[in-house]
A protein has these predicted regions:
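Phosphate- and other anionic-substrate recognition elements at nucleic-acid/protein interfaces
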Residues: 1-117
Length: 117
């Protein structure tokens, strides 16, 4: 990975995809629809991330993860418990979708889970 590595986290809810990108502190929200997932994937591809992390959310993460994978963006769907434990260890106990996206991006940077096809 390059010295200017870019990591993104996407917090997935039924209605929205909240995205956070490190280290540039870029954040945005898109609708959690097929079109919204493609827009997120296109925008992230332009940022050339080293890794994008999403939590498993009972299948709601699949459109976004699939859109990223189709574009060749390295993406990992992780167990929410792993991320929750990571957040606790870093003292980030606040709970909003935007903060969760930031924690996911930090998790991607610190842990660097391996992308799987």
């Amino acid at each position: 990975m390059s010295t200017n590595a870019v990591f993104a986290g996407i917090d997935v809810s039924k209605a929205h995809l909240d995205v956070a990108v490190r280290p540039d502190e870029i954040e945005w929200r898109s609708p959690n629809t097929d079109t919204g997932a493609r827009e997120v994937a296109d925008r992230l591809k332009d940022l050339d991330p080293d890794l994008v992390v999403l939590e498993a959310t009972g299948g709601m993460e699949i459109p976004a993860a699939s859109a990223l994978a189709v574009l060749g963006v390295p993406v990992v769907v992780v167990n929410p418990r792993q991320v929750r434990d990571f957040a606790k260890s870093t003292g980030r106990l606040a709970k909003t979708d935007a903060l969760d996206a930031r924690v996911l991006a930090h998790f991607a940077e610190a842990v660097r889970p391996e992308p799987r096809p």
